[in-house]
Structure formats: structure tokens, C-alpha cells
């Protein structure tokens, strides 16, 4: 049944029906045997390949172990590369995963980064067909690592789940790459003079802790820092504008250190504060003007409205301050809220002034009427005497009386004549006459105009200047 067998048959066999069937069966059996032999050969080849694939890692693993043992033999991880010869150059790179949130109360922000450092260590050179050794974090403690620390960090956490998020690569020429993932709470001193229209540059500073610049030199591996998609960052009140990196030297008692800094430029979004503070303050001021259209004799209505608006402004001022640290200077929001409070308080004082002077005038009119009624009947008239109407006789009144009446207005008497009697006489000279009854009419024009001018100057000054 092998493939080398030869079958001889005569034409007479073809005419025999029985022998013809046997011949066909024989040919089919021969073909099936050839297929089985080929399948066995292919299985043998696959088995050989599988055996090679299984054995290859064992040989490779042994080579790596041998390389690592030879590199670490006599290696002192307490000494930096090229010590006593030249400074060790550290190339740094940062990939920003996310920024936020920013805490204005504690003046700090949170940032999640992948921090990479690259340097050359001639003690780690090796000769092998492998160009790079890809190692895990277990090898980190066995070689020299730069003592880089973040200078403005308040709290830093390395990620350990599910394993330490650290990476180590060693090239055959001695180049070492070390990366790790960090979450840092860094200081960011906010200047809140223009709050909530402020912009800030939050720094992230790092340098060597113990090696001055003549021992370690830091350099940026790339001219710019890479960042992830900012739309997933938890900045909330802030918008990410951009970033920039810089290098500077810090002069200290222990030496001169190279400081690497990344500045994250942020601008505050005004939407929250517009809804929570600015619009309520404006509406409260406008509401206080309603009292100018209420009858001046409606004392309870105008008084309650004025007091309510003043208390509302006090509450808004307190709420606006809760989202800020207790700074000693005036912010833009403080200025706006304070001016709104002044307008509301002035509206209340306007009615107090109006009510005071109108009440005095009513009392004076009542006294005059009583006096006239008493003098209208004279008990000592003789028969035949002529009766002269008293209303045609002007009562003697000196200029001191005018002065006394004007002085009742206290400071008002210095520049204004606050009573109708001040229209004439020497007290009228050099003074502006104000009709008390029309103070509400004046206020309806003055208060809205003054508030509109203030808003114009305020918003143009803080947004465009």
C-alpha cells in the first residue's frame, strides 16, 4: 500500500465487473494512504516548531539573568554616574493626564502626571543581541536613581494598583529610562484682586534634593509638555488656557540648584458667580428703587422694602465670601457687592430724609393754623371800631427765624435751603433750593443713572483694561 508499489493489469480485467470494482477500491485506498502520510509529516513539523517556541524563552531568560547579574556585580547604587568626572545630565519629560480640581480656599491644585527621567550610566553598558532590557519596578532599587523631588508639593502619591506604576528600561549603551505615575497636590498662590475675572499661572516645580548643578544638570527632553484631552479634566470654575515650561537656578546656602518649572495657565469661568452673586445683587438694587414710586405717606411699605433689600444684600455679601480665602485686600466682587449695598442703603436713607422733612413741615403748618385761629378773634374791640382781616397782615418775622428753620436741617443748611421759607431772605443767597416733595422724582433719575455708569466703568475696567 505504499506509494512506490506498481500495479499491472490487462485489458481483460477491465471487462470483468468484479475485478473492476476491486481495482477502484484499491486505488481509493492508495490515495487515502498518501493523504495520511502528508498529514503526519505536517504534524511532525508543527511539533518541531512548537518545541522551538517553548524552548526559546528559556534560553532568552537565562541570557537576561546573566546580563543583569554581570551588570549588578560590583555596582554601587549609592554613587551617581560619572561621579568626580562630570555632571550627570538628566533629561526630563512630563505627560499630564489631568489637572483639577483647583482649591481656592487652600490655594492648591491637584495634578496627575507621568514623570519620565533619562540619563546615561556607563556602568550599565552590556554587549548582547538585545538592544534594550525591559524591566519592572523590582529593579529600581538596585541601580542609582536621581533624587528628584517636587518643590511646591504639599502631598504626593504614587500609584500602586495593581502593581507599582513604574517602568525601567536599560539600553546596551548605558542609557536608562525611568518613569512613574504621580498624583500631586501642589501649591498655587492665587492673586484674587480681579476675582472672579482673574487669571492664574499655577507652577509645578521639581529639582534635585541633594545634588547641586555641578553634580546634576536637568534638561527638558522636549521643548513642550504633552497633555491629555482637557475636556475630561475636573477644573469646574476654571478653563485651561495653556502651559509653558522654564528652567532657572536657585541660589541657596547649600549650593546652586537647577529648578525645572511647568506653568499651567488657567482663567476663571464667570458663569457660576454671575448666577449666584452678580444677577441677585443687580436685581436687589433695582428692587430698592421701587420705593421711589410708592406714596411717601406709606411709611410701613417703604420702610419694610428698604430694610428687606438691605438685609438681602448683607446675605449676598456673606455668601459671596464663602468661596474665597480670607484675604486682606478688596477683590472685584467685594467692590461690586459693596457698591450695590451702598445703593440699597442710600435708597432707604432717601426715604428717611424725605419722611423727616415732610413731617417737620406738616408740624409747622399745623402750628401756624392754630396761631391764626387764635388771633382771628380779639377780645378788646370797642364799639365802632373797624375790624381788619388778620390774614392781610404779615406777622413780623426776622431773618433769624429763617436761619433757625434752615438750621433744623443741620448740615443741609450749609449748602441747601431745605424749607419753603428759605426761598427768600439772606439765607437764600449761596444756597440751592430743594423741594422736599420732589426728592422721589430726583431719585428716580439719579439712582438708575448712577448705577448704570458704575456698571459701565466696572465691567469695562475689569474685562478689557
Curated annotation (Swiss-Prot):
Gamma subunit of the heteropentameric ligand-gated chloride channel gated by gamma-aminobutyric acid (GABA), a major inhibitory neurotransmitter in the brain. GABA-gated chloride channels, also named GABA(A) receptors (GABAAR), consist of five subunits arranged around a central pore and contain GABA active binding site(s) located at the alpha and beta subunit interface(s). When activated by GABA, GABAARs selectively allow the flow of chloride anions across the cell membrane down their electrochemical gradient. GABAARs subunits share a common topological structure: a peptide sequence made up of a long extracellular N-terminal, four transmembrane domains, intracellular or cytoplasmic domain located between the third and the fourth transmembrane domains. This is Gamma-aminobutyric acid receptor subunit gamma-1. The keyword Magnesium does not apply. PANTHER family: NEUROTRANSMITTER GATED ION CHANNEL. The lineage of its organism: Eukaryota, Metazoa, Chordata, Craniata, Vertebrata. Keywords: Cell membrane, Chloride, Chloride channel, Disulfide bond, Glycoprotein, Ion channel, Ion transport, Lipoprotein, Membrane, Palmitate, Postsynaptic cell membrane, Signal, Synapse, Transmembrane, Transmembrane helix, Transport. Heteropentamer, formed by a combination of alpha (GABRA1-6), beta (GABRB1-3), gamma (GABRG1-3), delta (GABRD), epsilon (GABRE), rho (GABRR1-3), pi (GABRP) and theta (GABRQ) chains, each subunit exhibiting distinct physiological and pharmacological properties. It comes from Rattus norvegicus.
Amino acid at each position: 500500500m505504499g506509494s512506490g508499489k506498481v500495479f499491472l493489469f490487462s485489458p481483460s480485467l477491465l471487462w470483468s465487473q468484479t475485478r473492476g470494482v476491486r481495482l477502484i477500491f484499491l486505488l481509493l485506498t492508495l490515495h487515502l494512504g498518501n493523504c495520511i502520510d502528508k498529514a503526519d509529516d505536517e504534524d511532525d513539523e508543527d511539533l518541531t516548531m512548537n518545541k522551538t517556541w517553548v524552548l526559546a524563552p528559556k534560553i532568552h531568560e537565562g541570557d537576561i539573568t546573566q546580563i543583569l547579574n554581570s551588570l549588578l556585580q560590583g555596582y554601587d547604587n549609592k554613587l551617581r554616574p560619572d561621579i568626580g568626572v562630570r555632571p550627570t545630565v538628566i533629561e526630563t519629560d512630563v505627560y499630564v493626564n489631568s489637572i483639577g480640581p483647583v482649591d481656592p480656599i487652600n490655594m492648591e491644585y491637584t495634578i496627575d502626571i507621568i514623570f519620565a527621567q533619562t540619563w546615561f550610566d556607563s556602568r550599565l553598558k552590556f554587549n548582547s543581541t538585545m538592544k534594550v532590557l525591559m524591566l519592572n519596578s523590582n529593579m529600581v532599587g538596585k541601580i542609582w536613581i536621581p533624587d528628584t523631588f517636587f518643590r511646591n508639593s504639599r502631598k504626593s502619591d504614587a500609584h500602586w494598583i495593581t502593581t507599582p506604576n513604574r517602568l525601567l528600561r536599560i539600553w546596551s549603551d548605558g542609557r536608562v529610562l525611568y518613569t512613574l505615575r504621580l498624583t500631586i497636590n501642589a501649591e498655587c498662590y492665587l492673586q484674587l484682586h480681579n476675582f472672579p475675572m482673574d487669571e492664574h499661572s499655577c507652577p509645578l516645580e521639581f529639582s534635585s534634593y541633594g545634588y547641586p548643578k555641578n553634580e546634576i544638570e536637568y534638561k527638558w527632553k522636549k521643548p513642550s509638555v504633552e497633555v491629555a484631552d482637557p475636556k475630561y479634566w475636573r477644573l469646574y470654575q476654571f478653563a485651561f488656557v495653556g502651559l509653558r515650561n522654564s528652567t532657572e537656578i536657585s541660589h541657596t546656602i547649600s549650593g546652586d540648584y537647577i529648578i525645572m518649572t511647568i506653568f499651567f495657565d488657567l482663567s476663571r469661568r464667570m458663569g457660576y458667580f454671575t448666577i449666584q452673586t452678580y444677577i441677585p445683587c443687580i436685581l436687589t438694587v433695582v428692587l430698592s428703587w421701587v420705593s421711589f414710586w410708592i406714596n411717601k405717606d406709606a411709611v410701613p411699605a417703604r420702610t419694610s422694602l428698604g430694610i428687606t433689600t438691605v438685609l438681602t444684600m448683607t446675605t449676598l455679601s456673606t455668601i459671596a465670601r464663602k468661596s474665597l480665602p480670607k484675604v486682606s485686600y478688596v477683590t472685584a466682587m467685594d467692590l461690586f457687592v459693596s457698591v450695590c449695598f451702598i445703593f440699597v442703603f442710600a435708597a432707604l436713607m432717601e426715604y428717611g430724609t424725605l419722611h423727616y422733612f415732610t413731617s417737620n413741615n406738616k408740624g409747622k403748618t399745623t402750628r401756624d393754623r392754630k396761631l391764626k385761629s387764635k388771633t382771628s378773634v380779639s377780645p378788646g374791640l370797642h364799639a365802632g371800631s373797624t375790624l381788619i382781616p388778620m390774614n392781610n397782615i404779615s406777622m413780623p418775622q426776622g431773618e433769624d427765624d429763617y436761619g433757625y428753620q434752615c438750621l433744623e436741617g443741620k448740615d443741609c443748611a450749609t449748602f441747601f435751603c431745605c424749607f419753603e421759607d428759605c426761598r427768600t431772605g439772606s439765607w437764600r443767597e449761596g444756597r440751592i433750593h430743594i423741594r422736599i416733595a420732589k426728592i422721589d422724582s430726583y431719585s428716580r433719575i439719579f439712582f438708575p443713572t448712577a448705577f448704570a455708569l458704575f456698571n459701565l466703568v466696572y465691567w469695562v475696567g475689569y474685562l478689557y483694561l
